[in-house]
Amino acid sequence: MKTGTILLSALLVAALQLQAASGAPGDEKAADSDYDVVVAGGTSYGVAAAVEAARAGKKVLVVAPRSALGEDLAGTLRLRPEDGASLPSWLRERLYAPNPDARPSLGVATPLQVKKALDGALSEAGVAFRCWLQPCDIAADADGLVTGLWVAGRDGRAFVKAKEVVDATLWASLARRTGNLVLDLPPDQEAKFARNVVSGERPSAPGLTATAVSDAAEVTTADAALSPQIAPAPGAPSNVSARVWRCEKSFPPGDLSARALARIEHEMRDATWTRDQADAADFVYLADPPAGIGRAHRIAKIVRRPPETPVLAETDVLVVGAGTSGAPAAIAAARGGAKVVCVEYAGRVGGISTEGGIGRYCFGLRRGFTSELDAGVSKVGSFYACCKAEWLRREGRRYGVDWWLCAQATGAVVENGRVVGAFVALPDGTYGAVRAKAVVDATGYALIAASAGARTEFLSDGELSVQGAGSLTRVLGRSHLNTDAFFVDDADPADVSYEWLRARASFGPWVWDQTSVVSSRERRRMRGAYCVTVQDVLSGRNYPDVVALAHSNFDTHGQTVDPQFSVHIPERKHLVSSRIPYRALLPEKTDGLLTVGLGMSAHRDAMPVLRMQADLQNSGYAAGLAAAQAVRKGVELRDIDVRELQGELVAKGIIDASDVSAAPSAPLSDAELSTTVASLDYDDAALARVFADASRALPILRRAYAAAREPERKLFYAHVLGALGDASGAETLAAAVDAAPWDDGWNYRGMGQFGASLSRVDSYLIALGCAANRGRPAVVEAIRRKAADLGPKSAYSHFRSVAKAAEGVGAGELAADLSRLLSLPGVRGHALAPSALPRIEGYAKDSTWIGAGNEERNVCLRELALARALYRLGDSSGLGDSSGLGERTLRTYVDDPRRVYAVHARSVLAGGHSARSRSGGGECLPGECAF
């Protein structure tokens, strides 16, 4: 795990630990560190200025708005040496060093090469830097002297103290807003803008000129064979002799405000589109920039103060996020007659399938809006990711959607307990409010819901269980690649920034670029008016307010925590269908808001079935129609006519009339429940009905256990009782654990994980770990004997089950056993120092990366499980120098740059020794959303 570790500047620690708040003005926090200089912007000239300041002995921080440095070069696809002619020679040499391994080679630098060169330049100079943070406003004292910089990220706004700010933004926006730069823009002279694209065909449009600025190389739709869905349109080429084109067009005189630039951006995208486009720049740029644009501006004093938190726009429906669910929501709301603004961080519409690199559907129902979308995209052109993004963008514009690209929402605008908009940072740093009559949170991590005060679920002091994520390569011509290599909290820009930096450092030189959307499968979720559980999914529950359908298997990408899954979990071939109720999109109390996508209200173990792209597109569309209806009728989102909405959804093909007419699922009668328990086995649907109605089922299960005569049957009932937290069968379970040797366990697996993440003995141990078993000697001894049989090479699931059982029983006498396990060779010491940047194993390969990151997560989860349990058992092992080992181990993770581990360790420590672990994240549990 230590192999290939890169040591970064210690200052990176402070940058990564920059704290922020909910996003509302007046609710911000300051960074922990002060800086001599803060460079606003991740441009190449910003990096040069930062290195120069560091060489002069100053403490420097660079704050970059995109997922990586280099928005002026990589973000605009200006990749020739002449594009960096004004840069210092030492930096030009790094940026444009020959790269014979690039595939395909266009004779220019690749965007990834630019980003990695800038990463390296700052790291070697000892400059701290953070991406995913938009510089907004320069703060000053009463005399105008600079005191720091306001930045905006996906977790709110933060303030960085500094004596000097260097404006290195694309448009010198901070210098212009504070009166430190006045551009000489003739009021009667047209401005010529440029946009670079990669295509075979020369872009052509009225008034547009296109010049080739690279060599040509063959780009092929190599992954089209994976699925007809991502194949080229009929008549579109599958092999393209592509090159970089610089496209220029003149526009009438105007300003360089963010909204003016956005209009030009969309017009340039219209003009530069070709059927065989393989990539395109995120930003336009001035072909002949006036003095002041494209260079750094040192600002120690401001001349004028910009207005504080202006209203940027007022609209009917605001959709935050233009990804898998958000883009369909925006289109649906606009089709429903609403005026729509859609705010999106990325440079393209479409989310994970266009900007995240996972283009091909896995499962899901390709019906409704998804069917329309697929049919439309199939006619567009050669390369699926580009074609899908363009179809969505154009379809939205056809109905009046105002797409705000490269803009970062930071939190909700709340008035009297109602969401009335969101705070947004525009690409030029302008920060203000977008007010709306209805808001759809399509961020995927419940940003607006969380900042509005809604309950959310993700990381906690419970067991650390997170579905795996990854950062993907962008390869010209390829629309689909999948990976699972680390854990990440999408809501935390520090965590995303660190893992993106790791991924870039790990990618091979053949890579064209890095994706800008996190390919994660589990994120912060809103706790809504209804929470969809595993039991709902497995029992096929009907809802009176069904608005979407889902279809998949339990592709868990790691371990599960639902108690039912400790008894039995469906295998890979077991596909299930589920309905999604409207209430799962509504907050418990907050009005004015719907939450869609991975942020909707559902148990983490139910999400693998609910999160398929095809289904999320349809549920997003349903949310957009609901928002439009609420605005049209002037009612709250929770008070819309659901039957009317369902009629629209049936007409669209998103749900069937039979879904609407089906009687809502009701609890089993006493007789039915007794019959179900009497014949209960490993049938998932039957188990689901029992686990969903646990309070009524438990007395029946106890009687069945007592009456059982066959040992296997008695053990089965004891197992189910234990999983439900009942100790009636504890002696039977303990005897079974004692009688069975350790079986084949499970080591952590992200990609390709289907079925159980526990062995049978593991599941018996976990069933023993309920509080009612405290003080039962047979239970304690069974756990102890199994712990004694573990060694350094034992499977992770065995360590996990022993730790969970010991922690659950709360037997302090097991502390010595846990301490011994934690002291085994190779078990401890897997936390990272704040300055470490280990390569991700397997990431340099040109493949699907099956297995990447598994071993790292395996050893960290094992160490944390043992340390957490030992700490909660009082952490007094009686082994002399091992006393306090659990706490000491947890504290090694407190400053780990992998924030998922750090947040978990801090939460456990904050709870103290006496805290009891929850199931794994504060999720809705069986029975909490029962019939």
Feature locations, PLM:
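Structural detector for internal amphipathic alpha-helices that build alpha-solenoid repeat scaffolds
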Residues: 682-695, 703-707, 712-727, 735, ...
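Short beta-strand to alpha-helix junction loop
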Residues: 102-117, 378-391
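Short beta-strand "acidic-cap" motif of Rossmann-like dinucleotide-binding folds
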Residues: 59-64, 339-344
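Beta1/beta-strand and adjacent pyrophosphate-binding region of the FAD-binding site
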Residues: 32-43, 309-323
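Conserved N-terminal glycine-rich FAD pyrophosphate-binding loop of Rossmann-like flavoproteins
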Residues: 66-91, 347-370
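Amphipathic alpha-helical scaffolding segments comprising HEAT/armadillo-like alpha-solenoid repeats
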Residues: 666-677, 694-707, 726-750, 773-790, ...
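A conserved beta-strand/loop element that lines the FAD pocket in flavoprotein oxidoreductases
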Residues: 125-135, 397-410
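Flavin (FAD/FMN)-binding glycine-rich loop and adjacent Rossmann-like elements that form
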Residues: 27-28, 72, 131, 136, ...
